[in-house]
Each structure stands twice: as C-alpha cells, then as structure tokens.
Amino acid sequence: MNFSSIGNLGCLRSFLQNECNWFSVCKKKLYHEYRCVATSSPVFAVDKFKDCLHCNIIILKKNLDFVFSLAINGIHAGQFATNSIKLKKIIITNDLVYYILELGSLTVTDLHFIPKYNSEHVLNVRPITPNLIYDTCSIVSYDEAKLLTVKGPGENKLIPLGCGSWCLNNMGRYYVYTFVLVYDLYLACFEKNTLPSLSKVVFDMISCNNKHCVFCKDHSKHVEQTGKTVGCTDNQETCFCYTPCKKKMAKISNQDLSSLLCDQELDLLDLIYPEKPTSLSTDINAYVHGHKNQEPVVLRNTNWILIRLDPAISRLILLSCPVCKRIVSR
C-alpha cells in the first residue's frame, strides 16, 4: 500500500478516526495494541480489503512523538508518526468498553522492524443486544421531539434511515432515534437477538421475495458490532438499514406481524415521508399508514415508544453497517 501522498495519509487518518471503533487487545509498558473490525470505507478504498477491514494498531512512544504500526486483514500496512494520539474511552457497561482514536497529522516512518500483531486474539466483550438497547435508551418526550426536524431546515435535522428510524449527527456524535415495541411486547413476541424497531417490523411485513432485489435482499456486508468476529456477516437484527423496495401501497406478505400495528388484519402498508417542513412526531401514524379493503386504518400507537439510543451504542451499530455509515457521514 502506498501512503506516501498527503491525500492518502488524510484518507487513512479519517478512516482510523471516524470509521473505526477500537477495542483493547493488550497494554504493555512499552506499547499498547488495539483492534477494530470495520465495514467497507467510502474514503479509504483498498482493492484487497473491499468489504471488511480487520485492523490492528500497535502504538509506541518515541521521544516526544508517537509511532504506530498498522496491519489490515493480517497484512502489515505501514508505520506512521504523529505528534498527537488520544484514545477516548467509551464505557457502555463494565464488559463493553471501546475507544475512539484522535490523531494529529500523519507522516510515514520506518521502525526497521515489524512487530508481531495479535490478529487471532478473541475479544471478551459483551455484544449489542436488544435488552442492552432497552436498558440504556431514553424515551423521547413530545417536547424533545418537536425540537428535531424530520423535513426542512433546522439545527437538529434528522437523517432518515429505515421507516421510523433516524440519526442525528451532532458534530460526529451519533444519536439514533427510532420507534420500538414496548418492552413487554418485545419479550412476548420476539427472539432475544431481534430489536423490534418499526423499521424491522415493517420490512418483515412487506419486503419482496426477489433474490436479486437490492433493497430487500440481505447484502451480507455488515461486520459484527463489537469486533468479536472477523469478516462480513448477515444483516444485524439490531440495525436500522431495513428499507423495502416498495413504499407506497405495499402488499403485506407476513400477516403474523399485523397485530403489532393494528387490532384487525391489514392488506396494505403505505410508508410516509413528509413533504413539508415538520418536526419529529411521537405517533407512528405520521410515518406508516395501514389499509384494509382500500380503506385507511388508524394504527395502534400505544404498542410503540419513540426512543433515543445511547450515542456510544448508536456509533457501534451505525459504523458496522456499510449503508448506514455512508448515510450518516455525508
């Protein structure tokens, strides 16, 4: 890999800081090692490492500067010097801790030796589960919601994800807002690894069966959110990228989920995207309409709550998905 140009070094620095969640591998007196498993990057494009970038970084102090060695997918990528390295510690629980890397300007250097990377190290960290999301989220009040903009200008403009899910990018700090089933219904109706967001439920109701559909087919390009496994995985059951191909008067193919939206069986769903400037609503009827025999049906909003995810969890989820990562970082 050629990192000799300023542009390439800038892309590398941006990738390491903004697209990687770093987990500690070991901390020794002379060096620290961290690991990240990242999905494909929109800025750091390397043909050999297209869909998954498993990165190991070994940081050493040298005089007044810092030097680090980088390996990507088990291949030594280079050594770099910088006058500043900060690792911001993010604590979600005692068994789920990660770091965000902050770097000064980079230059290529050579230590005249290649350190041994712990590429096979298995991280002992807690996974992102629906229970963890419910435990750490905040319920969004009407007053908070009206300060957030779904359509139109505004400081707190939300970025749309799947149906009923959005992201607020506050200077690189991500907050996911989403409708989810009330906790009791989640326990009664869903497996423990599936977050019953409105995005996921609506997708499962109306997605098509065409294996070539770029919207409804599982693209299997996610990575595990806490870096425990290396390589791409199927769509995460806690992600918010679920977007069906048909959004207007879509036929319901999975009636088992209709009862979560309404007391009666529905024929069609209509996904609503506001056309006029408006703030965020706490009512699911603002974003999805149901129909029975061509007649509109009011959906049961009491089954749902609008929540704000912890920003530390939001970052782990969004950066593990190549679609969400590109949407929120624009």
UniProtKB/Swiss-Prot annotation:
Pfam families: Herpes_UL16 (PF03044). Its main location: virion. The keyword Protease does not apply. Belongs to the herpesviridae cytoplasmic envelopment protein 2 family. It is found in: Virion tegument; Host cytoplasm; Host nucleus. GO terms for cellular component: host cell cytoplasm; host cell nucleus; viral tegument. This is Cytoplasmic envelopment protein 2. Keywords: Host cytoplasm, Host nucleus, Late protein, Virion, Virion tegument. InterPro entries: Herpes_UL16/UL94. The gene is U65. Signal peptide: none annotated. Interacts with cytoplasmic envelopment protein 3 and with the capsid. Plays a critical role in cytoplasmic virus egress. Participates in the final step of tegumentation and envelope acquisition within the host cytoplasm by directly interacting with the capsid. Upon virion binding to target cell, a signaling cascade is triggered to disrupt the interaction with the capsid, thereby preparing capsid uncoating.
